[in-house]
Design a protein with these regions (language model features):
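Helical hinge/lid and interdomain linker segments adjacent to catalytic or ligand-binding clefts
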Residues: 24-33, 37-115
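Extracellular ligand-binding/catalytic regions of CAZymes and related secreted enzymes
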Residues: 24-28, 54-55, 72-75, 188-191, ...
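A glycine-rich, often tryptophan-bearing local segment used as a flexible ligand/cofactor-contacting loop or short
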Residues: 33, 86-155
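Short, solvent-exposed loop/turn segments at secondary-structure junctions
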Residues: 37-38, 87, 113-114, 186-188, ...
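Residues at alpha-helix caps and immediate loop-helix transition turns in enzyme cores, especially N-
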Residues: 42-45, 92, 119, 193, ...
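Bacterial Sec-dependent N-terminal signal peptides
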Residues: 1-25
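Catalytic beta-strand/loop cores that center a nucleophilic Ser/Cys/Thr
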Residues: 51-54, 60, 76, 134-210
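Oxidoreductase and adenylate-handling cofactor-binding alpha/beta cores
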Residues: 123-128, 160-177, 222-236
């Protein structure tokens, strides 16, 4: 009887340990929405960034350029990444709003920090904290970490350079504000703009990275670490 009790206790402990391990290693589901003009979204986001994020072993990324499918995909997603500049219909806008207002995380990459949607001003006000309407020509820019204490900048060099579009990103004073983590500096004019930042929101974690035009950023180690850190920060 004593042996049976010990066996049952050991089995129960095994089940508890297994359950805890499974909970700790749960793969989080990410929806990444790309598509639009001026960029090879499928190659550099749907393939390269997806590979970078999934290399952590913690995430499963579904990439789509079908914006009509956003409401369906968000029903099972844990985190949303937007990197598109193509239209999003009213149903998609409503689904994204509901998703974020319920406290789910949002990561905005490159094209998604633009003023893309005139019919959805609340997007830039509430989720971007401003936006970009122009950029410098494609050329080498300096990226400078200005908040080295933040989780998103851990392991990132204090300065790193690559060829990209320097977005002239302007914060909106009517928004709840952003916290700038990395700035991009023009080698041509010395002008500086937010390169990576978090957006203040009462319910959700939101972060943004403004660079990401082509392989020169997506395959750069600093960019890849910044991307992974941003996803980790939002997910946790």
């Amino acid at each position: 009887m004593k042996n049976t009790t010990k066996l049952l206790a050991a089995f129960a402990l095994l089940l508890m340990t297994t359950g805890t391990t499974l909970a700790q290693t749960k793969t989080l589901r990410i929806l990444m929405v790309g598509g639009g003009g001026s960029h090879d979204f499928a190659r550099w986001y749907g393939q390269e960034d997806k590979k970078t994020i999934e290399s952590t072993g913690k995430y499963s990324v579904t990439y789509t350029e079908q914006t009509d499918s956003i409401p369906a995909y968000l029903k099972t997603a844990d985190l949303l990444i937007l990197t598109n500049n193509q239209p999003i219909n009213a149903a998609g806008q409503a689904a994204i709003t509901k998703f974020v207002e319920k406290g789910h995380g949002l990561l905005l990459l490159h094209a998604a920090v633009w003023y893309n949607w005139e019919d959805w001003p609340a997007y830039n006000l509430n989720y971007v904290g401003g936006g970009s309407r122009s950029h410098e020509k494609l050329q080498e820019i300096k990226n400078l970490v200005v908040n080295p204490a933040h989780a998103i900048t851990q392991g990132i060099p204090a300065r790193f350079e690559f060829v990209d579009e320097l977005y002239r990103h302007i914060p909106d004073p009517a928004s709840k504000g952003i916290e700038v983590l990395v700035i991009g500096q023009s080698k041509e004019t010395d002008a500086v703009y937010p390169g990576a930042f978090t957006v203040k929101h009462p319910k959700a974690k939101i972060a943004a990275i403004t660079t990401g035009h082509d392989e020169r950023s997506h395959q750069h180690e600093a960019y890849k670490q910044l991307l992974i850190n941003a996803v980790n920060w939002i997910a946790n």
